[in-house]
Amino acid sequence: MKKTIMLAVAFIACISIFAQTKDEKYAEDVQSIDAILNAYYDVISGSSQQPWQFERDSYIHSKNAVIIRLDENGNTNPHTLESEYIPMGLSPRQDFYEIELKRNVNHFGNLAQVWSAFEIRTDPNITSDIRGLNSIQLHYEKGRWFIDSWTCEMESEKNRLVSDFLNEN
């Protein structure tokens, strides 16, 4: 009898955990600008043993989010979030940590613009010299924040944008 009751309780607990909607699972990620930016860095970072968090990443972005990368000559490579996932899903995951170094937020009404400097590491505790700057646009709708787009440029020998951004007051 005790075994049956224990199994029933375990079954109900599993159903309630796995039956959560995305809104229930990731609601805290989108309640503030800080929360969504922390989730943004969290979903991309992790060890090679951790699975990609595609569902969570998709949830924090708006449906038609655009990603733009600038090369060292200023040329753009715009694409959708879904096309970002394709190469990630096709190759084995490696240890990768995008660590935020500094954030500047401008927030007016339901709009926000975030400048965020980051460093790419293969170990979260060992600094690296691979750095970049994100420009992230967000909007607030239906009680939550969405990332609409982000543009990234990596620091290079001829463009010290992260150093300049970190040295700003």
Question: What positions do the PLM features span?
Answer:
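Short, low-complexity N-terminal intrinsically disordered segments enriched in polar/charged residues
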Residues: 19-54, 59, 167-169
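Surface-exposed, charged secondary-structure patches
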Residues: 66-67, 76-124
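A short, polar/proline- and glycine-enriched secondary-structure boundary/capping micro-motif
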Residues: 78-80, 125-128, 157-164
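A mature extracytoplasmic/lumenal domain signature
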Residues: 71, 116-118, 151
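N-terminal, post-signal-peptide region of Sec/Tat-exported proteins
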Residues: 48-76
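Hydrophobic pocket/interface hotspot
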Residues: 40, 55-57, 65, 114, ...
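Short beta-strand edge/turn micro-motifs at domain boundaries
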Residues: 131-161
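Bacterial Sec-dependent N-terminal signal peptides
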Residues: 1-24
